[in-house]
Amino acid sequence: MSQLKLEEISSVIEEKIKNFELDCDMAEVGKVVSYADGVAKIYGLNGVMSYEVLEFETGDKGVAANLEEDSVGVIVFGFGNNIKEGTSVKRTKSLMKVPVGDAVVGRVLNALGEPIDGKGEIETNEFSLIEQKAPGIMDRKSVHEPLQTGIKAIDALVPIGRGQRELIIGDKQTGKTTVAIDTIINQKGQNVICIYVAIGQKESTVAQVVRKLEEYGAMEYSVVVNASASDSAAMQYLAPYAGVAMGEYFRDHARHALIIYDDLSKHAVAYREISLILRRPPGREAFPGDVFYIHSRLLERAAKVCDEKGAGSLTALPIVETQAGDVSAYIPTNIISITDGQIFLETDLFYSGIRPAINVGLSVSRVGGAAQIKATKQVSGTLRLDLAQYRELQAFTQFASDLDEASKKQLERGQRMVEVLKQAPYSPLPIEKQVVIIYAGAKGFLDSVSVKKVVDFEERLYPFLEAKYPQVLEEIHIKKALDKDLEAMLKKALEEFKLTYSE
């Protein structure tokens, strides 16, 4: 039996020591002290950052929301059914990010940026933090380009500009989502990426929205971020921030984007739920004190960026649901004060057949007027006042039957203008056609048409113009203003159509 020499043994040991790799993975680990309703209390993570992503040994993830002296309050993304007392948690040392860029366009994602449409993984190397600082004053430019919704009542009376925040507010079932979807459909060919964030909606409602967008070919330039009613409060709270991070990518790359939050009332409720579980002190309507801040920091990220930064824009259309038309409730007043105007939809108008049910008196656009094209300004300059006078006269006629001729004429024209502003859902109208029909109503071309036939008159007018006077629509589209020659041509076209039109 051969004996091993001492030198051989030492050389083998030396070789082993040389090849030994000290692969030590340092991780800061804590333990779950308590877990209830999607919020975990963790002990032992002293160096954790605010809103840092944490990993549970069960595979669940969450973000650190409450940083206390001896513990950390963590919002868990899913329902965390396997998390229990004693479960270990480790830091990732990274804040929450979502995929951004063209790879997400045409997809349906959850609040974490994960695809839920069954079309495979999102292949991108571009990610963005969901919490970003809004552009400062010097990085912004005043709103001056129109963002047309295709809805006559909005584009004429409460115009929206690129980079604006315009609130859509009203009771449930008044057509708020329809206004938003119409606006998305109308962005076709305008090089605007649209992001629809569904917060606390029914899965069936979101599926219907996606179907509508696909039907009108709008999904090609849209992203849907969904945190439905069946998702946890954490997912509903994070969804708008994930959506705006995707929109900011386009804004910062000299492109234009539109984001719709449907709706921020449910977002506030989700945040209230999380805050109460985290034992934060409740305030008015049991909302935490910083509920204003969560919405202001979200909506301030919508902006028109200055030329030096690429002149991109992100326009926001937040939706808020009111209870019995009460716009003076906590969340509605908060968001009205943050936004640059509101479109107020009314139940009474909706049920009386005026759709979209926009209350022209209460709706306002604080900055959009500068973005309106000249042609629309020319034809709708006195429209708001005319409609207000019509409503006043209408109320007066309920008590007095005898009216002078001028008042009767005003009442008749007002009725026709209300008909002109009616519009079927999912049928946005190009701005040049809007200019034509509002001009026809304002200049008295509809005075001899019966009120019931105004919609029919409008439907037959467009094919007539396209066939016989295509240059009228083309010139309004190109010039974006009505000069004397163009107005004369439009008058001639309308007079000729009136002769051929029979009710």
UniProtKB/Swiss-Prot annotation:
Class of the enzyme per the UniProt entry, highest EC level: translocase
Signal peptide stretch: none
Keyword GTP-binding: no
EC number per UniProt: 7.1.2.2
Reactions catalysed, as given in the entry: ATP + H2O + 4 H(+)(in) = ADP + phosphate + 5 H(+)(out)
Record keywords, A-Z: ATP synthesis, ATP-binding, Cell inner membrane, Cell membrane, CF(1), Hydrogen ion transport, Ion transport, Membrane, Nucleotide-binding, Translocase, Transport
Keyword Aminoacyl-tRNA synthetase: no
Top-level taxon in the UniProt lineage: Bacteria
Membrane topology: Peripheral membrane protein
A GO cellular component annotation in the UniProt record: proton-transporting ATP synthase complex
Site (Required for activity): residue numbering on this chain: 363
InterPro entries named in the record: ATP_synth_asu-like_sf, ATP_synth_asu_C, ATP_synth_asu_C_sf, ATP_synth_F1_a_nt-bd_dom, ATP_synth_F1_asu, ATPase_a/bsu_AS, ATPase_F1/V1/A1_a/bsu_N, ATPase_F1/V1/A1_a/bsu_N_sf
Pfam families: ATP-synt_ab, ATP-synt_ab_C, ATP-synt_ab_N
A molecular function GO annotation: proton-transporting ATP synthase activity, rotational mechanism
Main location: membrane
Subcellular location: Cell inner membrane
Annotated binding of ATP, by residue: 170-177
Role summary: Produces ATP from ADP in the presence of a proton gradient across the membrane. The alpha chain is a regulatory subunit.
Assembly behavior: F-type ATPases have 2 components, CF(1) - the catalytic core - and CF(0) - the membrane proton channel. CF(1) has five subunits: alpha(3), beta(3), gamma(1), delta(1), epsilon(1). CF(0) has three main subunits: a(1), b(2) and c(9-12). The alpha and beta chains form an alternating ring which encloses part of the gamma chain. CF(1) is attached to CF(0) by a central stalk formed by the gamma and epsilon chains, while a peripheral stalk is formed by the delta and b chains.
Record family assignment: Belongs to the ATPase alpha/beta chains family.
Record protein name field: ATP synthase subunit alpha
Gene: atpA
